[in-house]
Amino acid sequence: MKTLIDYLRFRFTASPFQALEVVRSALGFVTPDLVDLGGSEKGKDGWQYRRPIILGGDEILGYVDYGGESQRGWSRWDMSGAGCSWIYRWDLLAQFLPSIGGELRRVDVALDFFGGEVSHDDVLSAYHRGLFKKPHVGRSPKLKKVETSCPTDGRTIYIGARTSSRFIRCYEKGWELLAKAKVPEGFKTASSGFYFRRNTPSSPADYYRLEVELKAVDGFFIPLDILTNPDSFFSGAAPYFESLVESAPSRLVQPPSDFLQVQTLQSSMEHCSRAYGGLLRSLLELYGDTVETKARLFDALCSQNPSDRLVKAGCLSLPVGAENAR
C-alpha cells in the first residue's frame, strides 16, 4: 500500500459503544482499551449528543454524534487523521462495519512525498496540462490557490468544489505541520530536519501531500473496498494521481510519529521562555539563584491544571524525557 486513509466518517444504527468496539478491533500500535469515549456533550449538526473519541485519557481523535429525532436512528462517527493513524487492520474494520449498520460517508485518501519528489509547481503544471480532468469531460475542475508572501506559511491548492463527491487538496504538508505546532519562525529553517516520520528526518520544504476527499453525496456511494485498497481510489481521482501512485514507494507500516506532540511541547516552552523568561530571571536575581528558590517559584507560578491545548494535542502521553520526535 502506498497511500493512507487520513479521515474517516461513517454513520451507523447501533449504539456508540458498539461502534467503539468495532473500531477497537482494528487498532494497532496501542492497547485497544486506551481508546475510549469521553463524557456526553451537547450535539452538533442536528444530533442531540456527542462524545469525544479519546486516546489515553487526553488526546482527542474524533467525535461520535448520536440522538435526535431528525436523524432517524442514525449516529455518526468522525475520526481525524490522528485517529486513523492508529488503525492497523483496515480489513477488520471493513468486515465488521456492516454488523453495526455502518455506511461510509467520507473517506480522505492521501499520498505523501518526503524527499522533494513532488513539488507545488509540479502540481500546478499537471493541472494546466489537463491531468485533473475526468475522462470525457471538456474542462478541468476549478482550481483555487492559497498562499502568502511568506514561504514558510506553506502553499495549498484546492481542486473541485468543496461540497462535491470528489474534492482534491495538494499542499506543503511540512510547513503546515510546523504552523500547527506553532514552531517559532526562526526555528523553521534553522533545523536540519524534522521527524515527520519516526527515525527519519525530512526538510519541511520537501514534505508534500496530495489528498482526495470522497463524500457520499450527489448519489455517490463509497464502497467498503476503499478501506482495504485506497491506492486504487486515489488513482481514480485524477490521471495525475494515477501516475504518482505508480512511481511512489510503498509506505512503511509503523506507529504514528509523535512529531506534533513533541514539537508542540517544545514550541510552548520556547514561547514561555520568551514571554516570561525575563520575569523568572529577575525573581532569581531578587531571591537567590538556588535550587530551593527555583522550586518555590515553580510552585508559586505553576497552574493547578495542565494546558488544555497540550492535553488535547496528546503531549501528556509522551514518554518522560522525550526530546525528539521519532
Model-predicted regions and their roles:
Residues M1-Q263, S268-R326:
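Structured, helix-rich domain cores that form ligand/interaction pockets
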